[in-house]
Amino acid sequence: MWGQQVGQGMDISYSFYDQSSTFTYTTSALTTAFGDGIKAVIQDCFDTLSSLTLLNFSLLEETQNQVGDIRLGYQAGPSYGAAFGPAQWSSDSYGGDIYFKTEAFESWESATSGDFYYATVYHEIGHAIGLEHPHSEGHYADSLVFGSNSDVGSGARDAQPYTLMSYAAYQGGGLGYADDQRAQTFMVDDIAALQYLYGSNLTTNTGSNIYGSQTLTLDKPFETTVWDAGGIDLIDWRHGTLASIIDLSP
């Protein structure tokens, strides 16, 4: 995790790879700059994290002598995305750095909420701030893992309806995502882990809010979680055209 004590917030800077700066540990050159599309998704993710926790994120312009705590860039390679956890390379500057596959440039730049690329941005940033896969045994020293079963999909909550960090589309599912249904944001177990690590933002959605078919994207199946810190709220699905499952479990 970032910081020295659980439950505490902090300021974290992030920067986009610039060709005037360097990634000394990469196996291939980072020669493609981020476009506005993926930058917007990344900013949305950091805004979401700030609304959930006491973390504050700020964008830093890279120079040869100055880079963010978290660095993001495109890199050629077999994986669509990869991230160094904050404690994985504690003696180096690698912790928190993220790269996305250059060959999928067009897809990253056109990513939309609920698709594979949008979810992968959130997933990799999740790793960078200290979340592990629920099926992993804790490869990063400070990463928080829900459950301890190493078989993908066999854990009762190892599924995307509970955590964006899961590789399973549904409970009991194996490795792989559903083509048309992915978590749109950090899910309930992710939020519990994040708030344990970095505290809860109790100023988010404290009024009387309405959530439902008038405010959510409904053109395909989706999974989402709402963090609401107070007020008298309403979930309204009167205008929905798809069947829904609403889970109010604490």
Sequence positions of predicted segments:
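Zinc-dependent metalloendopeptidases
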Residues: 1-250
